[in-house]
């Protein structure tokens, strides 16, 4: 039924010639049924870790003991890796996330019924075909996300499943079943028990989904609980390109909310600078105004802010892009490094080191307003007319005579 790669076929052959069972399980089976090539493969078996390890080593697979306590090993061959986990039952949960106790089982159904959604609770082997006790294939065909068994219990066991339901809805375009949706809202307060890093990871995947707008609109209350701020602008998601930084810029209002969700410092700084720059675009109507803005912001936050601004004000953004093209085509200066005059030249003329930055900044302001002034001789004369050289204590700009 499924087209399996060579190493995967070999794995199944090993187990079929042994007393043990082996099945593909979870997301890879779901992807196969949807016509999607899986990115990775999870397998499950009634063999204990020690038994699987012995089988695999005999057939020249490398074995990594990646999760012995959880009954998991990784089989490697020809740069391919496969996680194999013993059938298991989870008993009790710590802080609505991790099971208190794992009990290994001899029955596949025990392993499938502990899973989150019916679409992820399907197993497959080449000899036995699909094993689907919770009608997962039907939910895939109906494009529905439905919990295995009682939804509130599934969310109580692992509160991250609440966000996973929303994320799958956004990425796959599936609707959340009525009973599962009711449990999402009923159990939303359990999300406070989860680590910020887990919340951030699921939120990122959700925001990058093709149905992010529809899901965010329907479950805005849940997402506001996650990000701890009021969401004021969802409409941008309808047409926003699949760029995470841009979507974060539109989705969040305050940098502090990103920091609270443990986003990297680089992301938070980029967000802050882009927010500032975005506000300034409303007042940009000339090349000179635009160059002064380019002077203050690196190109990464500038371009990010402009891409977002284009979603809200496409006509004005197009005008700004036209001005930007003129600036770059003409090589007009807007940074200190673009100046014909360098700090070393100022030092050789007797200007003190601590004043050089201020002088170059004044020069830059002049050439931004008139690019023709960006000539070494002109700038030297301009500086001499405005600043005193040598080691004088008072190096304030010279006052111009009326």
Regions found by a protein language model. Name each.
Residues 1-402:
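Catalytic cores of the polymerase beta-like nucleotidyltransferase superfamily
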């Amino acid at each position: 039924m499924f087209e399996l790669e060579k190493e995967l076929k070999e794995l199944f052959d090993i187990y079929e010639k042994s007393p043990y069972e082996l099945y593909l399980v979870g997301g890879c089976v779901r992807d196969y049924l949807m016509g999607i090539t899986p990115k990775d493969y999870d397998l499950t078996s009634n063999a204990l870790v020690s038994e699987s390890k012995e089988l695999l080593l005999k057939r020249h697979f490398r074995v990594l003991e990646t999760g012995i306590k959880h009954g998991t090993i990784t089989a490697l061959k020809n740069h391919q890796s496969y996680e194999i986990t013993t059938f298991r039952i989870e008993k009790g949960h710590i802080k609505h996330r991790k099971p208190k106790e794992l009990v290994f089982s001899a029955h596949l159904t025990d392993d499938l019924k502990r899973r989150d959604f019916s679409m992820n609770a399907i197993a497959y082997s080449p000899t036995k075909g699909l094993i689907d006790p919770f009608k997962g294939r039907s939910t895939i065909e109906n494009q529905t996300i439905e919990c295995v068994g009682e939804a509130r219990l599934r969310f109580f066991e692992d509160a991250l499943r609440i966000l996973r339901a929303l994320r799958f809805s956004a990425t796959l375009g599936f609707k959340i079943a009525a009973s599962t949706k009711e449990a999402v809202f009923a159990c939303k307060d359990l999300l406070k028990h989860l680590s910020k890093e887990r919340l951030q990871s699921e939120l990122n995947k959700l925001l990058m989904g093709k149905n992010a707008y529809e899901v965010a609109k329907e479950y805005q209350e849940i997402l506001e609980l996650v990000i701890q701020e009021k969401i004021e602008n969802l409409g941008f998601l309808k047409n926003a390109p699949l760029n995470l930084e841009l979507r974060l810029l539109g989705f969040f209002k305050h940098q502090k909310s990103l920091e609270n969700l443990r986003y990297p410092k680089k992301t938070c700084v980029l967000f802050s600078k882009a927010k500032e720059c975005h506000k300034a675009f409303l007042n940009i109507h000339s090349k000179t105004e635009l160059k002064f803005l380019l002077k203050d912001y690196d190109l990464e936050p500038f371009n990010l802010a402009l891409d977002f601004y284009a979603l809200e004000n496409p006509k004005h953004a197009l005008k700004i892009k036209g001005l930007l093209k003129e600036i770059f085509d003409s090589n007009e200066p807007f940074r200190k490094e673009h100046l014909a005059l360098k700090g070393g030249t100022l030092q050789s003329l007797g200007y003190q080191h601590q004043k050089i930055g201020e002088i170059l900044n004044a020069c830059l302001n002049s050439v931004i307003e008139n690019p023709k002034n960006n000539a070494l001789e002109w700038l030297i004369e301009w500086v001499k007319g405005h600043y005193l050289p040598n080691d004088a204590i008072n190096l304030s700009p010279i006052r111009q005579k009326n």
